[in-house]
Curated annotation (Swiss-Prot):
HAMAP family to which the protein is assigned, alphabetical: MinC (MF_00267)
The organism's place on the tree of life at top rank: Bacteria
Biological function: Cell division inhibitor that blocks the formation of polar Z ring septums. Rapidly oscillates between the poles of the cell to destabilize FtsZ filaments that have formed before they mature into polar Z rings. Prevents FtsZ polymerization.
Subunit annotation: Interacts with MinD and FtsZ.
Gene that this polypeptide is encoded by: minC
Protein name: Probable septum site-determining protein MinC
Pfam families (UniProt xref): MinC_C (PF03775), MinC_N (PF05209)
Family: Belongs to the MinC family.
Entry keyword set: Cell cycle, Cell division, Septation
GO BP annotations, alphabetical order: cell morphogenesis; division septum assembly; regulation of cell division; regulation of cell septum assembly
Length: 284
């Protein structure tokens, strides 16, 4: 006989989207200095974002003090929720943080291309601007999109669901979600396929899609396309003023100013050899 359901709580299996803080060094002082350098200009950027500490890049004989790394992340107002480690990294289980499993989004099968060909063709003759030169990768750590999942009951992390944002009217099909209202700070939209936004994406708002993102209004918040590893995803918007843009985990933030020919302009953004490319759209 199955136990009676409780009216007070439920326990379910599930997955939670987080950032992965990918550790690539055991030098804690260098990591602290790099974190300070990268985020001192935007201390609120990752405020209250949940993050899992990923130590799988470390060599088998290397180990780091996970409690100290958690304190470092706290110092930039991130919220560590667990550790992702290889099976042979048994020392990671000694941390007070729970062990998590994670899907490798980069290894996911790419979705079919579904970019707007008319817009792409209109921009074909425009010069491209690469974003990679503005944000060189760090030898110490990376921040990447990830999806830690609950593992066995002994190691699973319980994460409270975020408060629901104010309802937004959506029109969806099997491939595309349409948002016809402006998004205010704190609102977040996730689309399984492509996402079309007809209103302003304000500072502090976030639009996320497994496919392409089309924004027919200013983008001032965050836009993350191809979040399940689709390197062919693109971002299109009519006015680029973002806090963050990301495709398949490759991202760029406002700590690196955008060139004048794309800032506040209609653009498309795509990945080319692991670099974000930003190109003006010629709409007339």
């Amino acid at each position: 006989m199955s136990p009676k359901k409780s009216p007070f709580f439920e326990l379910r299996s599930g997955s939670v989207d987080t950032l992965l803080f990918v550790v690539k060094t055991t030098d804690l002082d260098a990591m602290r200095a790099e974190l300070t350098r990268r985020f001192e200009a935007t201390p609120e950027f990752f405020a209250n974002d949940v993050v899992a500490i990923d130590v799988r890049r470390l060599a088998e004989n290397e180990r780091v003090p996970l409690a100290d790394i958690a304190q470092l992340l706290d110092s930039v107002r991130m919220r560590p929720v667990g550790v992702v480690a290889n099976p042979q990294q048994a020392w990671a289980a000694e941390s007070q943080l729970p062990l998590l499993e994670a899907r490798d989004r980069r290894g996911a099968t790419n979705a079919a291309k579904s970019a707007d060909e008319d817009i792409a063709n209109a921009a074909a003759a425009a010069p491209a601007v690469t974003a990679a030169t503005a944000t060189p990768p760090s030898d110490l750590f990376e921040l990447a999109a990830g999806t830690p999942e609950n593992g066995t009951p002994a190691t699973a992390a319980a994460v409270e669901p975020a408060p629901a944002a104010e309802p937004v009217r959506l029109a969806t099909s099997s491939q595309t979600m349409v948002v016809d209202k402006p998004l205010r700070s704190g609102q977040r939209i996730y689309a399984k396929g492509d996402l079309v936004v007809l209103g302003l994406v304000s500072y502090g708002a976030e639009v996320i899609a497994e496919g392409n993102i089309h924004i027919y209004a200013p983008l001032r918040g965050r836009a993350l396309a191809g979040v399940q590893g689709n390197h062919d995803a693109r971002i299109f918007c009519t006015c680029l003023e973002p806090e963050l843009i990301s495709i398949a985990g490759i991202y760029r933030t406002t700590e690196n100013p955008l060139p004048a020919d794309v800032l506040g302009k209609p653009v498309q953004i795509w990945l080319e050899e692991e670099k974000l490319m930003i190109e003006p759209l010629r709409l007339t």
